[in-house]
Amino acid sequence: MIKSIILPEENTKITVGKPINDESNTKVIAIYDYREEPEEAFWVHLSNGNDLFVDNHEVIVEYE
């Protein structure tokens, strides 16, 4: 299970259970790896029901 993804180019870390950014109450529910699927991206599911797709080429993945 993915715990977090780090985007070095943007100096950003997206972590399950934490707000998507410092100014938001919206938390990350789950991160799914679809890099081998047609989407070729990470799918980030948010607590407000929205989804975020991260398709940066340089991503560091941290697992639980």
UniProtKB/Swiss-Prot annotation:
Superkingdom to which the source organism belongs: Bacteria
Protein's recorded name: SPbeta prophage-derived uncharacterized protein YoqI
